[in-house]
Amino acid sequence: MLDAPDTAVLAVNLGTPETPTAPAVRRYLAEFLSDPRVVSIPALLWQPLLRGLILPLRSSRSAAKYAQVWLPDGSPLMVYTRQLAQAMQALLPSLTVRHAMRYGEPALGSELDCLAAEGARRIVVLPLYPQYSTTTTASVEDRVDAWQRRNPGVTVSLVRDYSVDPGWVEAVAGSIRRYWEQQGRGQTLMFSFHGIPQRLADGGDPYPQRCEASARAIANALGLASDEWQLGYQSRFGRERWLQPYAEPSLWALAESGVKQIDVVCPGFATDCLETLEEVAMGFTETLAERGATMRYIPCLNAEPDHARALARLAVASLA
């Protein structure tokens, strides 16, 4: 696709604890929840609460959840991100393709340092967040901008959003089609996206519009009528109002209205992780079963060939 030996692509995912243990989860959450892009409460107020109450309470509980989805080679997010970067490398043999995490290891800044030390003079940073948000993509952008100021000899570009990129949309639609061909089609398809606080959207974060655009584009690619799919938001944290409709209560309402088989896909997540596997595939399925309905979870794209091809094309296009 491109002959550029001094060019690298760095695929950046959110991050994961190194092990499914309370100490590892505590280290990870401490970094993640200390990012002002994630929690905007002033540090003088937030840090005592975080370290004195939230981390002691959440670390063990979260570790138990991670243990339920952990793979032999590590956390699903890490395993699939690594495999995805390897698949992209196979498609871009004249470039260097690596992966990094915004929180945890391999750290974003360290991987940029390594690529520069190895001779990269152009680096494409590809956050694995299809829909731009100030809580995710912008946090990566902050780190990249700070690194760029310290390393003016390297040109860094960043893919900010690919929520309606045709290659990515078709990759998601194709994965859903294949699932339906093998397993049959449910009565309704739910697109479940990670939520953000409503106040961020009110303040101008375009994330909900990006999610809606993604859902519409995928539904159109599948030929779905407007009454054959829904959108919801999951993973609410804290007590404030987040984006609505909330996914799980929406699923309950479908079950209570007589819908007995519901398919759920999470196109805001590039790879499967705790939120898709434990919260959705396990948790949503269980609570829907209690209401007499069956939920089938359609996996994320992970390292599927169509996913790697779509992201490789995005990286190359950003170099034009």
From Swiss-Prot:
Main subcellular location of this protein, as a coarse class: cytoplasm
Functional note: Catalyzes the ferrous insertion into protoporphyrin IX.
Assigned protein family: Belongs to the ferrochelatase family.
Cellular localisation: Cytoplasm
Identification of the protein by name: Ferrochelatase
Pfam families in alphabetical order: Ferrochelatase
Entry's EC annotation: 4.98.1.1
GO molecular function: ferrochelatase activity; metal ion binding
One record GO biological process: heme biosynthetic process
Keyword Membrane set for record: no
GO cellular component annotations of the record: cytoplasm
Catalysed transformations (reactions): heme b + 2 H(+) = protoporphyrin IX + Fe(2+)
Binding of Fe cation, residues: 194, 275
Keywords: Cytoplasm, Heme biosynthesis, Iron, Lyase, Metal-binding, Porphyrin biosynthesis
Pathway: Porphyrin-containing compound metabolism; protoheme biosynthesis; protoheme from protoporphyrin-IX: step 1/1
Signal peptide: none
